[in-house]
């Protein structure tokens, strides 16, 4: 009798353990479109990029409900994911990897422009380094101007090695976190360069890649390209780093139309006088302070942001490239200090 009870207990523990195991997967397409509902017509919530590890928490037909590191919970199709066991995920995470640094590219079957395309790539995608011997990176993994890479599902192919760098350890800055001493001036310049490379990319609600970006997606992908993880949304990005004062007249009780009408060059220059290159600039409701937009300050009264498309605009009324909603500036934060 005791043996039977013991066997039952062991069986129950085994079933419980199996039931509690998380279903994990890795994004295997250049961009994974995460939608509000399991339907192609459903709203795009965000994108995740190749090489990102996600958790599967639901299933409906060929749709998988996933939780990404952003964190976001939404639906993606099974073909954009490679499901892995816990052991496979551990092995994947330990493997040496490349970060794809160009705005856009391809993986081909052979190291030549005539090679058949296996998949496209966008900046921020992560690819495994091809290893021929255990623990050693193969010197034959590079072929002239080409590098051999491995996709999450194990397929291998070739892309330009100039567009790759070894993936470094990433800094995760969450809302409320200080970033003091974590980001230097050189890194911030690289963030700005990444943003400039995306100029002209169309605005896409929920987008976070060279295929389309929204305002906070632009900020997140440019920092991610430089091994810094920021929150996905502007309302959380504003809570990172060090707050910088926006010095402007009290607008309490005034309508947005009144604020816009009274916003002049002197008020604008005074509002941004404390900003330095690389600061994040936030816009929204001047009375409530709610955040609806973000850009990266470039200095000289200009910022780069995603509005209609990725573009550079002035924050000073009267300038030729003046941003029409600059009067809605409400907050700013500094990540490099």
Each predicted region: which residue ranges?
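Loop/turn positions that initiate beta-strands
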Residues: 51, 122-127, 278
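Aromatic- and glycine-rich peptidoglycan recognition patches
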Residues: 83, 109-118, 268-270, 287-337
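Boundary regions of SH3-family modules and the immediately adjacent low-complexity/disordered segments
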Residues: 20-23, 39, 50-55, 60, ...
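Second-shell loop/turn segments in exported
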Residues: 114, 177-182, 202-210, 284
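...with weaker cross-activation on analogous glycine-rich loops/strands in unrelated enzymes
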Residues: 229-312
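Sec-dependent N-terminal signal peptides
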Residues: 4-13
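Active-site nucleophilic cysteine motif
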Residues: 195, 207-226, 230-233
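Short, well-ordered loop/turn sites that connect or cap secondary structure elements
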Residues: 48, 121, 272-275
